[in-house]
Amino acid sequence: MSLPERPGASQAYNQRSVYRNSPSRRSRPVDIETGGYHAVDNQASHQRGKSGSSFAESIGINSNTESMPLSPTSPDGQSRHAGPEQPISRKRSLIRPERNRIDRDHRNYHYHKHAAHMNVLPSSTGNDPIYEDFEASTERTNSNYNEGGSDGSPRQRRTVSGDHEKSAAVASTLPTPDRTKSGKIKRKSRRHSKPPKRIEEQLRPPTFWNVYCAIVTFWAPGFIMKCCGMPTRAQQRAWREKMGLISIILIIMAIVGFLTFGFTATVCGAPQERLRVNKVDGGNMIFHGVAYDLSESHHPPAQGMPLRSDGLGPNVLYDLPEKNAGKDGSFLFQNVNGRCKGLITLAKGSDVPTNDDGDLAWYFPCKTFNQDGSSKVNTTTPYYSGYGCHTTLDSRNAFYLDLKGAADVYFTWDDIKNKSRNLVVYSGNVLDLDLLKWFNSTQVDIPERFKELRDKNSAVNKAIRGRDVTRMFQSSSDKKYAQCFEEIIKVGSVDTETIGCIASKIVLYCALALILSVVGVRFFLAIIFQWFICRKYAPTKTSQSSDRRKRNKQIEDWSEDIYRAPIRLPGDVGSTVYGSSDRSSKRASFLPTTSRFSSVGGPDIRSQGGRRMPTTMASQSTSNQLLTPNSMFKQGNDSRASFLRTDPYSSTPTDGPGPAGFIHDAVVPQPPSDWMPFGFPLAHTMCLVTAYSEGEEGIRTTLDSIATTDYPNSHKVIVVICDGIIKGQGETMSTPDVCLGMLKDHSIPPDMVEPFSYVAVASGSKRHNMAKIYCGFYDYGKNSRIPADRQQRVPMMVVVKCGTPDEASKSKPGNRGKRDSQIILMSFLQKVMFDERMTELEYEMFNGLWKVTGISPDYYEIILMVDADTKVFPDSLTHMISAMVKDPEIMGLCGETKIANKRDSWVTAIQVFEYFVSHHLAKSFESVFGGVTCLPGCFCMYRIKAPKGGHNYWVPILANPDIVEHYSENVVETLHEKNLYLLGEDRFLTTLMLRTFPKRKQVFIPQAVCKTTVPDEFMVLLSQRRRWINSTIHNLMELVLVRDLCGTFCFSMQFIIFVELVGTLVLPAAIAFTFYVVITSIINSPPQIIPLVLLGLILGLPGLLVIITAHSWSYIVWMLIYLLALPIWNFVLPTYAFWKFDDFSWGETRKTAGEKTKKAGLEYEGEFDSSKITMKRWAEFERDKRSRSGYWGSRENVIGGGGQTWTSPPGHQYNEEYYSDA
């Protein structure tokens, strides 16, 4: 918890303060995620005054030094070293400058702002960094929240009417403080300073979204909305935005419906009736490739067409001597004198009628022929005379104008390639070259090319028969022949589709391929993760069975009841039997593992395979690299180092300083850093339990499960944060009283605990809140279900948000929401890591944790977040920390949540398989890419800080200023922001992590299991899923804009997130379309195969997942129940959620005594007076505390005295249980 030293104020290396050398406070110069530090040329030599021998002497030292710049580049992008004579030149780079511009939209903007205030200069000599002195360089000040340096200034927020922060106005009017020679702060007179003015809401131009929502809801003016129960502007704005979102959802649904049903009908249209050749029945007759229905026709009176007895003309199909049913009559209506004019000429002695222009009356004999091409050329029987060729104007008008074709005759390519035929294709038309044989050479003359093409024995005919000759006949002469053939020997068209129909099929098959690929890839990658990837995160052994099937059966039995305890397996690793795992490993090693050449403290711990073990805060402290001789983080390789607290302010090097007072005499001793009972280095972990209105039974269940996990108690601490003085519905005690009843051996008597101020996540006067800190050890109670031999000693801290005295008489005093509870701890961790100014509450948290754990809070690098109604499986914490330690790139993970009340009602029954699929299919697939989009707040884990690069370098993750700043946003105005911050804060934290660190991983650990109770009433489920669905939609909207996620284009997490977003929005339409397809497939014939196959795959693959992953066969039954409830999941719940977009309350869940369900949001009332909140660094708080108490580091008040030897506190001798053969 230290910052590097500012230049020009350093002391000798062996005299540096122990407090400023935390390994977590260093950052690599080339750290990608921090932006890095740049070298400073011509840096001055580092000198500083001599440090006093005691703390009382040290405060008299005045170090009036100026802070040199952090880097050559200032936050605004301008060089700090470039003078007038030194122009700024831009170097060549493959990266565009706007990519490196750190503006307010940059994901690391706030981190750079904090890094800019770090007092450090990078080393240009290769030596260790020079750190700020603990005694002399810290300014002594009694400044409140609105005074002092900018590094600890309150988080700036947007201001709205009724939410004025006095700090902003006061800061603008206060003069800059001057420091006198005596070291005191001299301020100018404030007599003439103007009082702070109220900051009104600034008028901003309407955005495109606001204009769109206003257009959509133009029919609902403000006065009508006031009459309908929406009097405030915020309610009206939320309702208008809701209607805007609903309109967009309806548009998307309409687009999906159009693509599903209307696109094909639009672009392809109703297909024209088509008849395949040789399938034209007897009621039709073919003319030039078109079938005409002549079954009810009558030929008008003409020569050779006698009238029937009924006075009507004969039917040409049945009444004539030659039956023409189903035949081709193209020669009866020949297309003459068109493109064939000049090619087909009159022969000598021909009796074909002609005129002066050379036009011919007919080309072929006016006879019919069979459609299959089997008719032979008849050269003996005379054909009909001219009247059979229909050469009169009346007959041609009757055919071309009055007669309508019934269907086109088409040929398939198999028909065209039939060797018995002589067919070719030109421009989609089928031409029968055998019809060229019907030319009578005595009547007409034809070109030799015609004779060559019709001859099956010619080379040309063999080359073109059965093929498409469109491209081949592009020459001028052949093209002329082909166009002539289209008029005289066309017998049909090739079996083709229109461009629209082709486009429709392309869209259909592309969508099919996309859906199948997404569904298939998700399934197979989920299987790969379950079988292979997740196993590399598992520890070598835990307290539970290592057999996978046996363990799954044990978990299923355990999850049947929320209060059922797991089976205890004898002989396995257990936190109550120290050294049980070490005994076998120690005896198995016959040869010595160290020698006189081994490094002291074992800084280079390696696994059995020779690979370097992962870095943790505890493991790195065994190395002296980059640590000053008297570093507070220099721990010995034994258990004594955890509670060793000598005088921090003596002039001689001693072990690290602690808070004034004492370290609890019952602190859990720290094991040696190389003690690895589970096969990986242990990491210190905080277990955060957020409580609101839960009762004693629920909280006891959660804390019992955490306290009895097999992870060593020396490396875990329970932190319970009670969100206000709340009494749950039907409870006799308030939640804070319940939590305090589970705490014993208090470091400070409960009646002596005072409330301390902090900045809450709220608006107006509620930004000032107060809370009490209680520290001690977990109390299992007199009637505990946990056996006495398993009741371990676990350090515990309870934070009770009690509110300010002004709200003591109001309902829910101190209540600020779950996000505020999380921010209390997250902001505290950020202040600890960056050594920033902290509030009084955070100072008490720091000291309280140190007293009950024996180590600095800076040691904690992992945080487990659990709701107060969740029970954790005994080895779950071990599995989760194992994954964190083995893969430093993992920044967040979650386990599987089981349902404990499966059989309470039909409402709980339909949720069982939904929980299973969401974990083992969705989260397993996302884990392959390290991009789990939702870490459930009821059971998840985040990394506070991560080791980076070389030894002793750490970067903030959850404690990153960008995470804390965005997550603690106190002014939410738009509907989108309210759904993010007020309904789905847990999911939004996951989104923030992915958005800030897109290259790091968030995974699912299936071995880590918890169980919880789910809603057993439909209205409660409806309210819960309304919050979850709306939160999911708005978080996916945020994630879809993150461009740096894994993959590219369609093969990326960004694309998968987009598909999930669209899929969530169209759920009601999708289930309606599904039922429509199923019903039409049953009624109509043939059924729609492709949609039914897709439906079967989507619904059936999860069942196959149950079989492949070897889970309980009972999940098949739960799957069938889930399928029956699909209309509820996909229609009722989403539709209700969409209509409730503007409802920001928690509905029927978590109701308190006397509470009525109402729409909620951030309430703006009063003004925030920041002067009531004191902000100082830990060193300043500690100095003031010691000044008031008169404690100046006397040897008798600190464990260990002032010498170089140490004495253990009462009841704690050397910790021999970690080594069984010690």
Curated annotation (Swiss-Prot):
It is found in: Cell membrane. The chain crosses the membrane at residues 205-225, 243-263, 513-533, 1055-1075, 1089-1109, 1113-1133. It holds the Pfam family CHS4. GO terms for molecular function: chitin synthase activity. Residues 11-24, 42-77, 616-630 have a biased composition (Polar residues). Residues 1-101, 138-200, 576-630, 1202-1222 are annotated as: Disordered. Its EC number is 2.4.1.16. It is a multi-pass membrane protein. It comes from Gibberella zeae (strain ATCC MYA-4620 / CBS 123657 / FGSC 9075 / NRRL 31084 / PH-1). It catalyses: [(1->4)-N-acetyl-beta-D-glucosaminyl](n) + UDP-N-acetyl-alpha-D-glucosamine = [(1->4)-N-acetyl-beta-D-glucosaminyl](n+1) + UDP + H(+). Keywords: Cell membrane, Glycoprotein, Glycosyltransferase, Membrane, Transferase, Transmembrane, Transmembrane helix, Virulence. Belongs to the chitin synthase family. Class IV subfamily. InterPro entries: Chitin_synth, CHS4-like_dom, Nucleotide-diphossugar_trans. This is Chitin synthase 4.
